[in-house]
């Protein structure tokens, strides 16, 4: 009885049609394609770091060429994120992966860590490229096209240390004062962010725990195959049965490993990305409130400084325009982000559910096939005795 011949026909899952559903309709008008790949390790006397190759292909007229290739390190991505937040304080900037080592990893720059970060950086740049406003940001263009020396020179053109410190001080002062009359729609938005943050963090923890338990289950199960093989050597009457069980366990181990890969590639990164998004949203709301707080302080000052009415009136007019622009930008980006979030999470959970169904179908079919073969054994022995 050859247990390697077990290849049970897997029933076609009715959920396979889900793969045919497209959540985002509309014509493909993409004209900017970005790939992050080819990580390289660099060791100096001061530090060790990784750079990634970024290949950009585009048909946009504002670019000097149709294809660019540069190398960037994580600090460059941080710089880009900061410049985008500075230029568009109330737009929802995609999150970067954490700078420090992910919990549970032994080596900071092992292959799994580097590949996980590469995927996250790739998604970060492509989310910016797909954003209707951020994609045309000048700093983003420079990031994609400038060589290392050019980028270093470009960075030095930004605001000086004192200017950045002044912005930070004003931001802290505004946060201490707090916003007095936040519009109702932004109160609702803030409540949504708080609730979403709590739930997505809980989902992230549960997902990580499920993956850990799945890993422990897999590590334990893969030991049972060899145990049954050794057992069969001392049980002559049960050789075929024990070897058959070992074969089934091996097949279930392969199915479990595939399921774990699906969790680590399809579900865990998406859920964790939206954990980081929830933190980004808190920052966006603070920056919106800061703009409104500046307006409120000028209005309040106007009541005490009659002599400077004309100057304050002009400043108030500018701040009213700034608040209106900030509110409109955030409201438009908020709806876009919510739709993307729903699509991403729905797709991640749907894919995971379908993978789970396939996993259980495969394991069930494996054991059913084995049990059927064992049920047929007595009749075969009886027929041999009759002969």
Swiss-Prot record:
Q: Which residues bind a 1,2-diacyl-sn-glycero-3-phospho-(1D-myo-inositol-3-phosphate)?
A: 73, 75, 103, 117
Q: Name one Pfam family in it.
A: PX
Q: Which GO terms describe its cellular component?
A: early endosome; early endosome membrane
Question: A Gene Ontology MF term for this entry?
Answer: phosphatidylinositol binding
What Gene3D superfamilies is this protein classified in? Arfaptin homology (AH) domain/BAR domain, Phox-like domain
An example GO BP is:
positive regulation of autophagosome assembly
Chain ranges of the BAR domain: 178-387
Q: How does it sit in the membrane?
A: Peripheral membrane protein
Report the subcellular localization. Early endosome membrane
Q: Which UniProt keywords apply?
A: Endosome, Lipid-binding, Membrane, Protein transport, Transport
PROSITE patterns attached here? PX
Keyword presence, Transmembrane helix: no
Domain spans labelled PX: 30-151
- Where is this protein chiefly located? membrane
Q: Which domain of life is it from?
A: Eukaryota
- Family note: Belongs to the sorting nexin family.
Q: How does it assemble?
A: Heterodimer; heterodimerizes with SNX4.
Task: State the protein's purpose.
Answer: Involved in the regulation of endocytosis and in several stages of intracellular trafficking. Together with SNX4, involved in autophagosome assembly by regulating trafficking and recycling of phospholipid scramblase ATG9A.
- Which PANTHER family does the entry mention? SORTING NEXIN-4, SORTING NEXIN-7
Q: What is this protein called?
A: Sorting nexin-7
